[in-house]
Amino acid sequence: CINALIALVIFSLCFALYNLTGDFLQWTAWGIGTYLVSTWIQSLSKRDIVAFTLMFKSKAAIYSFIAFPCIPFVGYAYSAFTPSFYINNHGMSALEIGTLIGLITAIGSFIGVIGGGYFGDKLRDKYVGGRLYVIFTGGVLITLVGCFGMIYSESKNISLIFNFIYHVGSSVYVGCAATTVTNLVLPRMRAMAGAFFILTLSMIGLALGPYTLGRISDAFESQGYAAGDAMQTSMALILIILIIPSIALFLAAKNLKKDEESVFERARALGQVI
């Protein structure tokens, strides 16, 4: 009965989105994926109530699962359309983009992931929510600065510098987010919690980020915008989604201490032998 209700809700949502956009394959694939994830969560409540409770009845975990995918939503979208942006707005060739953007992405992301993990651990020593503060600083603030600088700089070289800044900031969340999620569950279920965290990145960030940016850009072009202007405006508008992690990260940090300290206590109350 519950699975049927879940299917009905997802079908109604996807059918409405299909009618709005006309993209049958996009919403069919996303609907099937969402249904499978939803029914897995529902089945987990029957098979392993301890894991279900720690993962989905913890405010810190729920707010984290809401916040984290919004950062790669922007990242995946920008990765898909950055080449098009530089071709249309700065006249770069495919060779230039492949070389320069490839190097910027590799080096910036490396620095962001390693630096985010390092500073997240350091700040965690002083504040329980230290890793979440690092995610906010990099994934929201630095990302916003980098993105706006990249898309609105008239100079190609200045734009590439901001592109590098963006890649550093947008990669900061990876290690801190995974560690935050696994610290909210028992050791025996850390791989499952980490896998679900990565799944949310795919279902929201990868599946919807590039698609949304492309649809917005197409809508502007249909209104008479030049291709470069449409892409530039769309890349700016999509940053609105960062409002969600701006709020959710601080709500997660507010509940983090209580939820982390009570992990074993809540597990024992549900019959877990520790």
Give the positions of each predicted feature:
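Intrinsic disorder in cytosolic terminal tails and internal cytosolic loops
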Residues: 125, 252-274
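A membrane-interface helix-boundary motif in multi-pass transporters
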Residues: 17-28, 93, 128-133, 215-242
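Symmetry-related core transmembrane helices of the 12-TM Major Facilitator Superfamily/SLC fold
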Residues: 6-8, 26-35, 137, 143, ...
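Cytoplasmic membrane-interface "Motif A"-like loop-to-helix N-cap segments
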Residues: 121-138
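Loop-to-transmembrane helix entry/capping segments in MFS-fold secondary transporters
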Residues: 94-99, 187-197, 231
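Extracytoplasmic gate region of multi-pass secondary transporters
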Residues: 3-28, 59-116, 170-174, 178, ...
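Hydrophobic core of transmembrane alpha-helices in multi-pass small-molecule transporters
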Residues: 69, 156-173
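C-terminal ends and interior cores of transmembrane alpha-helices
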Residues: 137-154
